[in-house]
Every structure is written in C-alpha cells, then in structure tokens.
Amino acid sequence: MAMGAVLSSRTFASPLSSSGKQHPPQNNKCTCSSPPTRDKFSRLTTRTTIFQVSNYSRSTSMERFQLSARFHQPVVDSSTNYLTRWFYNANLKRRRIECFLTSDPINTGWLKPRRWDNFTSLDTACVQPDYKIPVRTRADCKAEQYEITGSPLSPSDVPAEAVLIGDTNEISPWWQQFPKRWTVVLLCFFSFLLCNMDRVNMSIAILPMSSEFGWSPATVGLIQSSFFWGYLLTQILGGIWADRFGGKVVLGFGVVWWSIATVLTPLAAKIGLPFLLVMRAFMGIGEGVAMPAMNNILSKWVPVSERSRSLALVYSGMYLGSVTGLAFSPLLISRFGWPSVFYAFGSLGSVWFALWQRKAHSSPSEDPELSKAEKRYILGGSTLKEPVTSIPWKLILSKPPVWALIVSHFCHNWGTFILLTWMPTYYNQVLKFNLTESGLLCVLPWLTMAIFANIGGWIADTLVGRGVSITNVRKIMQSIGFLGPALFLTLLSKVRTPAMAVLCMACSQGSDAFSQSGLYSNHQDIGPRYAGVLLGLSNTAGVLAGVFGTAATGYILQKGSWDSVFQVAVVLYIVGTVVWNVFSTGEKVLE
C-alpha cells in the first residue's frame, strides 16, 4: 500500500516545481514541504506540514474494505491555513491512496488524482489562474485504481501538487496476508490430527479383525503394544535428525512413513501376524519423530510471546484426532468393512504432505516469501543458528532443568496414559455403563483437553505479555497440570454417582491439558537449538511411563482396587510438582 498526502501550499494557479520535497515517515510522523515562495511582502517562505500517522499498518482484514487508519491533526503547520482534524485513509486491495486538501469551497468536488511515476511528482505550471485563493476548510480522501508508472496528467486537468509518500506495501488478499508462522503451526496441527487418527483406528478395528482371524486376547495385546516398539526407537533419533536436517524434512518423512504403514496394515494382517506386528512397529517409527520434529520447527518459527498458544493448538490436534478417529472408524467399518478405515485415514497423509512441501520451511531464513516485517518479529523472539552437527550429550545431561523435564514428563504421562487406556474399563466395570455408553464417554476427555489446552496457552502467553517471567509462567501452568488431576482423582475415590465420576474424569483431563503450556513448552525455552533432542529425551521417559503404568495398573487391579490405581498416580503427580518447581527454569541454559 502507498499512503500519501497531496498538498498544495498556495493558490492553485501558482506553479509548484519538482523541487517539492517528499519525506518518508519517521516515528509515525509524515512531513511535506513545498519549495520557497514569496509572500505579499516579497519575503521568501516555505510551507511545511507534519502529520501524525496512527495505526495505518495495523488495520484488520475486515477494515481493509472500510475506512481505516488516520492522519491526525498536524503537529506542526508553518502556514496559517486551517486543516481539519482527521485525514482518513482507505486501505483496499491493489489500490493506491491519496488524501486531498479540498481547495474549492464552492463546488466541493474532488481534486482529480494524478498518476505516480515511480514515487516522483512531475509538476508543471498551470497555464491560467482558474482558482481563487482558498481557505482550506476540510480534508477529503479518495481511493482510485492507480498505475504505478505512467505519464503525468495535463496541467490543465489538475492543479500543481506535492505528493508525500508514506509507505509502500503490496496489498494482497487476506489469505496471502495470513502470518506464515501460523500457517506452519496449522500444518503441524493437522499432522498431529492425522497422527492420532491413524493411531486410534486400530483400537476400533481390532474387534472385527480379532473375530475374523481368531486372535486371542494375548495376541490382541501384543498387536496393540507393537506400535510402541518403533515409537520408542525414534524418539531421540527423531530429535537428532530434526536438529541436524531441519524439522520440515523429518516431520514430512514421518507423516509419509506412517501413512504408508497405515495403508499397508490390512495387507499385512492378511499375510500373517508377524507381518502385522512389523507394520505396526513401522507405523510407530514414523509417529515417533513427529513430536521432536514439530518442536524443532516451532522453536524457529514461533516467538516466545506466542509459544504457549502455538504448542497448545498443535497438541490439541492430537486430542481432536482421537475424537475424529473414534467417531468415524465405526461408521467406515460398518459400511465398508474394517480395511476401509486404514485406507481412508492413511490416504489423507498424501494430501497433507503436498501442502507441507509447498507451504512449510524448516526456518524463517529458508522461506523466500516471508515478509521482512514478520521475519523481524519472529527473530525478535527466537534464535536462528547453523544446523546442529553434533549433540553435546554431556552438557545436556548435566543441566538440572533437563532432568526436571525428564522426571516431570514421566510423572505426567503415568497418570495420563492410565486414564486414557483404562477409562473404558472403569466406565464399564465400576460405573456400569454399557460398551456403547463407555465409548461415547471416552470422547469427552479428549474434547476437554483440546479446549483447555488452548485456554491454558492463551493464559500463559497473556501472562508473558504482561511481564510475568517465563519461569514463573511455566511453573504456574505445570503446577495446574499436576495438582488439578491429583485433586480430581482423589475426589474420584469419594464420589458415589456415575455423573460425578464422569465429571471428575473430565476435569482431571482438562486440568492436565495445562501441561502443554508448562513442560511441553519448556524444551524451546531452555534450549531452542536442541529442542528436538530435548523433547525426544523427555518423551522417551513419558512413553516408558505409559507402557509401565498401563501394565502396572493391570497388576494392581488383580491385587487391589481402583482406589489404589488412582493413589499411585496422585503420588507421582505430587512428586512431579515438587521436582518441577524446584529444578525447572524458563531461561535458556543450552546455547
């Protein structure tokens, strides 16, 4: 967009030479001055007007089709002419803007706009003095379709003018003005949506598959656990690859890999059980790199002021992916058979990958279409360095905040995996819901987590924006993520009605989602250059907690009760709270 004030300093019959000065805006002030002229006492005078510019670069997409932004009343005006208080500016696509001082108090018509020639003003004298000396009574604005280059209009058509050019930015449709960093965030969101859709479809499809192939419960458990063989394998490796080769390459590889494994799952099942186990492990390999790669790419793209919101949005993609997978898998299976769910969900990965290759880059410095303004904004809150060539393991493992991440991730995932894995059994055996009701109620915690994760992200970024230290914000949010579930699981042992039990479950998972603005955001705080490796380390501990916690719950239930299961989780939540508040930090400890 180009903004300018078209000013005439005297009578329109007076010539205005091309020596009229054009000043770029500085400190939101625009200056326009005319060449020296002689007043009635033959003294040489120069008229200079300074305008205060307000918010012309901050108009929203809706305001782009309305009058927006303003030239304020002049701060300095060396002439005695009166100028009205506001100069309005219209901000429209592919239009150039001129603000006119109306000089015809009788006819009140627009001054006919002249064309610009590469931001210069070609002025010539008017042949005849057609205008009287005006008293400038108002300011008007008019937007026209303009050519950037072109010959000046005839001096008989337009008075001599001085053009002040304020700013030049290409105006484009709103979808092209959408911040590139949030485009990357949304693509990561959809990758995590697909991640959990492809993961949970087996939990539904395993029922007709076990009937068709005659699998025992032990075999079903083996198939379900085979995913974690590959998932554990690539947690740390995914972080190393992402920090070395870039998050775009690694995340793209992961989505393609697990999508192919998903599509090939029906074929592997029909060939034989060993092939199915290998295919599920392959799928785990692909999904294992997703979180470290995402953490790497967002550490470069998202400034700290937006970190919590962006990560909360991405992780809510996982929760909504579970909801989507649990909702659509039964429909596809009942209509087209169990293989259809693998074909349908797996094929979506190719659509995502095409968009990823076109729109995403590993860092802002690699994106040729990124605007200078957005690049400055991003670099103001993040650090871009050369790709990592070697991992300083000794340095990383010597830092207490790193161990705070690892221990807290373990404590967090123990309770989370227990609730999400054993919840249908609890609803069925303890609360006496039937299988259909249990399945529907299992969706509720995922929805609750998706909602509260984004609420927590907004709160965290708001606190950071208001000057609260990042360390305190991370400790506050993670304390909620630990103590909230501990409180509601304790209450769960006391309630006597199914409705209250379901409410406690939902509140437990909702408060758990505040962890996305706590420990899940902290990897980028303490070591943005090694964000992928750090998440790989802590998430390895988290996955191990899920595996051991799920198995331990079965053992506890054989010897004890559900109260004992919840008590173990509560103890670990409290341990995690203490470790986190003592050893964690929001400051960078790894360069």
From Swiss-Prot:
It is found in: Plastid, Chloroplast membrane. It holds the Pfam family MFS_1. It is a multi-pass membrane protein. GO terms for biological process: monoatomic ion transport; xanthophyll cycle. PROSITE patterns: MFS. Disulfide bonds: none annotated. GO terms for cellular component: chloroplast inner membrane. SUPFAM superfamilies: MFS general substrate transporter. Residues 8-36 have a biased composition (Polar residues). Residues 1-76 form a transit peptide. The chain crosses the membrane at residues 184-204, 220-240, 249-269, 271-291, 313-333, 336-356, 402-422, 440-460, 475-495, 531-551, 565-585. Residues 1-38 are annotated as: Disordered. Keywords: Chloroplast, Ion transport, Membrane, Plastid, Transit peptide, Transmembrane, Transmembrane helix, Transport. Probable anion transporter. PANTHER family: ASCORBATE TRANSPORTER, CHLOROPLASTIC (PTHR11662:SF255), SOLUTE CARRIER FAMILY 17 (PTHR11662). This is Probable anion transporter 4, chloroplastic. It comes from Oryza sativa subsp. japonica. The gene is PHT4;4.
